[in-house]
C-alpha cells in the first residue's frame, strides 16, 4: 500500500494510437473520464496533454503499467514507462505507475452496464480505463513513483 498524495491527479491509459485520460482527487475520492488523445505525432499528443495540464493543474500523474495476467512484462510495459518519464520530464510532476491489469476489462464491463456501444463505446473506452487505473490508485493498490531520478 502507498501513501496517496493530496491534490488533483491526471491518469493515463497509454496506447500507441490512443491515450485515455481521467481526472480525479483522492481527498474527495472522485475520478471521472476526461479525454482521449488520438493521432498525430508525439509532439501533437503532448501538446494536447499540456492543455489538460494547464486546465486541471494536477499535482501528479498516474500511468497504467500493462503487464500480463501472471505479472510478467507486456510488450507495452517499456513504452508506458517511457511515456511516464516523458510526462515527468515535460511537466516536472511525479509519476505513479500502477498495474493496469484488467482496467480495460473493468471499463468494458462498466460501459456494457451503461449500455454504451458502437462508436460511442470506442470513443470513451480508454478514458474509462484511465478512470479505472486512477480509482485503483486511490484505493491504495500497489504503485511505483518516479520523480525524475532512476533508482
From Swiss-Prot:
Transmembrane segments: none
UniProt cross-references to Pfam families, sorted A to Z: RuvX (PF03652)
Enzyme Commission designation: 3.1.-.-
Major location category of this protein: cytoplasm
HAMAP family in the cross-refs: Nuclease_YqgF
Protein task: Could be a nuclease involved in processing of the 5'-end of pre-16S rRNA.
Full protein name: Putative pre-16S rRNA nuclease
Source species of the chain: Neisseria meningitidis serogroup B (strain ATCC BAA-335 / MC58)
Amino acid at each position: 500500500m502507498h501513501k496517496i498524495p493530496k491534490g488533483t491527479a491526471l491518469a493515463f491509459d497509454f496506447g500507441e494510437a490512443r491515450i485515455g485520460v481521467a481526472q480525479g482527487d483522492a481527498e474527495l475520492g472522485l475520478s471521472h473520464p476526461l479525454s482521449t488523445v488520438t493521432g498525430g505525432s508525439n509532439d501533437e499528443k503532448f501538446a494536447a496533454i499540456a492543455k489538460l495540464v494547464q486546465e486541471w493543474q494536477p499535482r501528479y500523474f498516474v500511468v497504467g503499467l500493462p503487464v500480463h495476467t501472471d505479472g510478467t512484462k507486456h510488450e507495452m510495459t517499456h513504452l508506458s514507462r517511457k511515456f511516464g518519464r516523458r510526462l515527468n520530464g515535460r511537466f516536472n510532476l511525479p509519476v505513479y505507475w500502477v498495474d493496469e491489469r484488467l482496467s480495460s476489462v473493468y471499463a468494458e464491463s462498466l460501459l456494457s452496464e451503461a449500455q454504451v456501444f458502437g462508436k460511442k463505446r470506442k470513443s470513451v473506452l480508454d478514458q474509462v480505463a484511465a478512470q479505472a487505473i486512477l480509482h485503483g490508485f486511490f484505493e491504495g493498490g500497489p504503485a511505483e513513483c518516479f520523480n525524475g531520478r532512476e533508482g
